[in-house]
Curated annotation (Swiss-Prot):
It comes from Borrelia garinii subsp. bavariensis (strain ATCC BAA-2496 / DSM 23469 / PBi) (Borreliella bavariensis). Residues 185-478 are annotated as: Catalytic. GO terms for biological process: threonyl-tRNA aminoacylation. Keywords: Aminoacyl-tRNA synthetase, ATP-binding, Cytoplasm, Ligase, Metal-binding, Nucleotide-binding, Protein biosynthesis, RNA-binding, tRNA-binding, Zinc. Zn(2+) binds at residues 278, 329, 455. It is an enzyme of class 6 (ligase). Binds 1 zinc ion per subunit. This is Threonine--tRNA ligase. The gene is thrS.
Length: 582
């Protein structure tokens, strides 16, 4: 559901209203608390407070009980338009509200909402009265720190999160889903499965891939390169830093500097770690002259970029400061645009299917009020994007005015096994950089023209994609992506020669296999490797050795007894080749 549609939804109004109820309950229980903001969000709501004394999650139950008492009053939510002077008087003891009021656009009206004994600076919307909210359908879910206005230089506030649904059944369903999400948290599984780590003492937001995780990442990247080569892309490698003139020309220093690392002074010049790969690809293009006969260029790179994300925004692999972007840029003529866009969309759908994502949603962002490029190019580009989405029957919503100033775009979102949407692929026209860097090609009539430039990311950040895969599969990667695909577990030492034969046969065929001939008990080994999410355990006893067979136990506890060795190898190789998900 889009943001605009959500605002009209009854749940949005209920969640907005319950946030006010929570703020009143907090102020009742903790006098002298200062209130900040409390909006509805996806799946719930929050409110930020400055407490005189810190609170803990132990206080949440008391707050919930007080909220239910307030809800029982059935009080109305009443909107009132007030003047600037009235607002300053009403909230004179609330410094965060005063800060908001002083930054208001005075051309807009100032509105407040009154409910029970609480008044808040608010645009709404809300439910008519508290009877519309089921007192058994909400729960406070946690406490976190949040800087006022998201600025680390400001006061750290206490944010209380909650969730609210239409009824108790919906709430229970959501809370069960939250528990499953916690179990699958990539940070938790990353540690348990020895996939990656983050070392705050070395640098927050920087990912260290361990051997297990590095193997999986290498498999992802190898597949990425192979498929890009098949689809007519040339692979590029570019530096991690560039001089300031490059970022000045691209516009990053004017519009993106807050998200860039500080400059590095060296050789009497200023350098910056790259936040994006685009200017480097353009530099390669501009090393020579190009004819219309040379185009299109499809250039792709797994390029590491660095972005100065705020500490509070960092979240494991999902939000990092150093990550590898699967960038591509297509440089083409006007007549090639339609085919190139359709091919990018087809390629994106194909790539996602190979990783087990078959449910896609798209958001088409149109021209904002301020933009570069002429109207005809914008209109043509939007038409092409719409046509491509229709041809591939991808459902989409239009984000009116949501395009970047330099061109329209499609954002593709995948839906994971927990029914969460993740924005991954972007297909973005750029009318800005070709102009800034004076990109040209010689057209059929011998004149110099600007090429069209399309930015394209499929997987987005490799690190983020890795984290999504961990949670999507709960750590149980498909066979083709598992760092170890099978483990041989001999029943006793008598079958040692045969287990070595099996090990060598599978290893030489390219299967990632391990032989465990330790003294641990067989059942303990099976439990260990199931916990490690290894797809197959080959159980070999004397009968299997005599008949040259194996028995297979899967990580989901399925049993296949006495399968012929060559048949087992053939089946596994087929699953790997076809990149089967199950």
């Amino acid at each position: 559901m889009s943001k605009d549609l959500y605002k009209e939804d009854i749940l949005y109004k209920k969640r907005h209203s319950i946030a006010h109820v929570m703020a009143e309950a907090v102020c009742d229980l903790f006098p002298n608390t200062k209130i900040a903001i409390g909006p509805p969000i996806k799946d719930g709501f929050y409110y930020d407070f400055e407490f005189k004394n810190p609170i803990t999650e132990d206080s949440l139950l008391d707050i919930e009980n007080r909220m239910r008492e307030i809800l029982k009053t059935g009080s109305s939510f009443e909107k009132e338009i007030i003047s600037l002077e009235q607002a300053l008087e009403i909230f004179k003891d609330e410094p965060y509200k005063i800060d908001l009021i002083k930054n208001f656009d005075l051309q807009n009206e100032i509105s407040i909402y009154k409910s029970h004994n609480f008044i808040d600076l608010c645009r709404g919307p809300h439910v008519d009265n508290m009877n519309k909210i089921d007192p058994k359908a909400f729960k406070l879910t946690g406490i976190a720190g949040a800087y006022w206005r998201g600025n680390e230089k400001n006061t750290m506030l206490t944010r209380i999160y909650g969730t609210l649904w239409n009824n108790e059944k919906e709430l229970r369903s959501y809370l069960n889903l939250r528990e499953e999400i916690k179990k699958r948290d990539h940070r938790k599984l990353g540690k348990e499965l020895d996939l990656f780590s983050i070392h705050e003492e070395i640098g927050p937001g920087l990912i260290f891939f361990h051997p297990n995780g590095a193997k999986i990442r290498a498999l992802i990247e190898d597949f990425w390169r192979e498929e890009h080569s098949k689809n007519g892309y040339d692979i590029l490698f570019t530096p991690h830093v560039g001089k300031s003139w490059l970022w000045q020309t691209s516009g990053h220093l004017n519009f993106y500097k807050d998200s860039m690392f500080e400059k590095i002074e060296m050789d009497k010049s200023d350098y910056y770690l790259k936040p994006m790969n685009c200017p480097f690809h353009i530099a390669i293009y501009n090393t020579g002259k190009h004819s219309y006969r040379d185009l299109p260029f499809r250039w792709a790179e797994l390029g590491t970029v660095y972005r100065y994300e705020k500490i509070g925004a960092l979240h494991g692999m999902m939000r990092a400061r150093g990550f590898t972007q699967d960038d591509a840029h297509i440089i083409c003529t006007h007549s090639q645009v339609v085919d190139e866009i359709k091919e990018v969309l087809r390629f994106a759908i194909y790539m996602w299917s190979k990783f087990g994502f078959n449910s896609l949603k798209a958001y088409l962002s149109t021209k904002p009020d301020k933009s570069v490029g002429n109207n005809s190019d914008w209109e043509m580009s939007l038409k092409v994007l719409k046509e491509a989405l229709s041809d591939f029957e991808v459902p989409y919503e239009i984000d009116k005015g949501g395009g970047a100033f330099y061109g329209p775009k499609i954002d593709l979102k995948i839906v994971d096994s927990l029914e969460r949407e993740w924005q991954m692929s972007t297909i973005q026209f750029d009318f800005n950089l070709p102009e800034r860097f004076n990109m040209t090609y010689t057209s059929e009539d011998g004149k110099e023209k600007r090429p069209f430039m399309i930015h394209r990311a499929l997987l987005g950040s490799i690190e983020r994609f890795f984290g999504i895969l961990v949670e999507h599969y709960g750590g149980a990667f498909p066979l083709w992506l598992s760092h170890v695909q099978a483990v041989i577990i001999p029943v006793n030492n008598i079958v040692e020669d045969y287990t070595i034969k099996v090990f060598n046969k599978f290893k030489n065929a390219g299967i990632r296999i391990k032989l465990d001939n330790s003294s641990s008990r067989m059942n303990a080994k099976i439990r260990e490797y199931q916990a490690k999410k290894i797809p197959y355990m080959f159980i070999i006893g004397e009968r299997e050795a005599i008949e040259e067979r194996i028995s297979i136990r899967t990580r989901t506890n399925e049993q296949i007894n006495g399968i012929e060795l060559d048949e087992a190898l053939k089946l596994i190789l087929l699953k790997v080749r076809d990149k089967e998900i199950s």
